[in-house]
Amino acid sequence: MKFTRYFLICISIFLWISCGSDKDVKDILSKSDALLQSNPDSAFTLLESVEELDVLSDETFAAWCLANANVRDILFKEPLSTDYMLRAFNYFKNKGRINEQARIGMFLGHAYNASQQRDKAMNIYLVALDLADRSQ
């Protein structure tokens, strides 16, 4: 009985922390979006302040990747890792709008290109181009 109670308390605390983390990141995403055009360096700093990416929901993680990739592109910084971008691309492919799929595809192509995976970059760029054409 004690074990069950302890287990339920631990699960409750974990869920409370996880949900709080998503809410905090969503606030950061909102603030960085407001700063993007006028102050992209500040938007980048805000996005980079997110530390525990592995506890975020897939939706929040994908939104963070898209925002971070966008600001990195504006500031001419290295792309995020292909692992991050592929996870975000798969989320948007299944649950995102077509324009989000096209944008994340372009950024995934940038990540592949930066990691010297030219064939994968070219293939995903073609997919992103097709998605962008269909979104108009």
List where the protein language model places each region.
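N-terminal secretory signal peptides that target proteins for export/translocation
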Residues: 1-3
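A "functional boundary" signal
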Residues: 5-9, 16-136
